């Protein structure tokens, strides 16, 4: 009888140890699962569906198209197709005008998708509204030494502005869902209107395009990083800017056709 009690007691102890071991394993699994969920290990949005790095839905397609048009403008400037290059600059501006609106229609965007949209838009902007205007001015002012200084300042200021904007926009979106009410400094996309205007002023006045192009590029670049608050245009302001752009675009198209 005593032996039976001892055996039974030993079996109870073993069962208790097994249950405790199972409990510890379950706790470890729960902890590991919580850590994986927090770090999002093995389940990143960038690896879903396509298997490729990046995002390829409709929210970023217009940004990709704008970048391609901007690069085409760079190639045209190198080939001395200056008017065609300016047309590409303005078309890239149109793409940039609507890509944010299109992206906002996707209400279920993940945090990664929103962050990617900000980054890819800025990278596209530096090509379209930084490199393209700089290459255009370099090609039309090859013999003016100030052009090199203007080009360097313009690209550097544009790059700094876009990097700062990315940081500021990420902080703003984390704090509020409201739309931006003002810009700090001149938006880099302003070159889509300013550079064609410089060309047209040179074409229809006695001022040489080579003289004003480098100076305008230098001034625009400095304005990119000036800590001046510029309120976003009202509806009237937007219509006015679109109207100015439409006039510039039509004149450039007419020059190509004629």
Show which residues each predicted segment covers.
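C-terminal membrane-associated helical module and adjoining short loops/tails
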Residues: 18-19, 27-44, 173-258
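Cytosolic, membrane-interface loops and tails of multi-pass inner-membrane proteins
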Residues: 38-50, 98-115, 164-181
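Membrane-embedded alpha-helical segments that form the functional core of polytopic membrane enzymes
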Residues: 61-119, 150-155, 216
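Membrane-interface loop-to-helix entry segments
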Residues: 62-64, 121-126, 182-193
């Amino acid at each position: 009888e005593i032996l039976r009690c001892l055996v039974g007691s030993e079996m109870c102890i073993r069962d208790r140890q097994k249950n405790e071991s199972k409990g510890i394993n379950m706790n470890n699994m729960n902890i590991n699962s919580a850590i994986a969920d927090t770090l999002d290990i093995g389940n990143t949005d960038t690896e879903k569906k396509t298997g490729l790095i990046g995002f390829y839905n409709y929210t970023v397609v217009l940004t990709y198209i704008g970048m391609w048009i901007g690069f085409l403008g760079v190639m045209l400037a190198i080939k001395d197709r200056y008017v065609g290059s300016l047309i590409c600059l303005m078309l890239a501006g149109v793409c940039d005008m609507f890509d944010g609106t299109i992206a906002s229609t996707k209400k279920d965007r993940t945090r990664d998708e929103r962050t990617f949209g900000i980054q890819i838009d800025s990278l596209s902007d530096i090509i379209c509204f930084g490199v393209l205007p700089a290459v255009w001015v370099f090609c039309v002012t090859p013999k003016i030494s100030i052009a090199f200084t203007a080009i360097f300042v313009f690209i550097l200021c544009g790059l700094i502005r876009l990097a700062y904007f990315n940081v500021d926009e990420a902080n703003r979106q984390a704090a509020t869902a409201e739309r931006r009410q003002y810009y700090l400094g001149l938006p880099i996309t302003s070159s889509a209107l300013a550079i064609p205007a410089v060309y047209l002023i040179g074409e229809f006045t006695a001022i040489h395009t080579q003289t004003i192009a480098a100076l305008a590029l230098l001034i625009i670049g400095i304005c990119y990083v000036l800590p001046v608050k510029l309120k976003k245009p009202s509806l009237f302001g937007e219509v006015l800017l679109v109207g100015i752009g439409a006039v510039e675009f039509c004149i450039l198209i007419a020059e190509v056709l004629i």
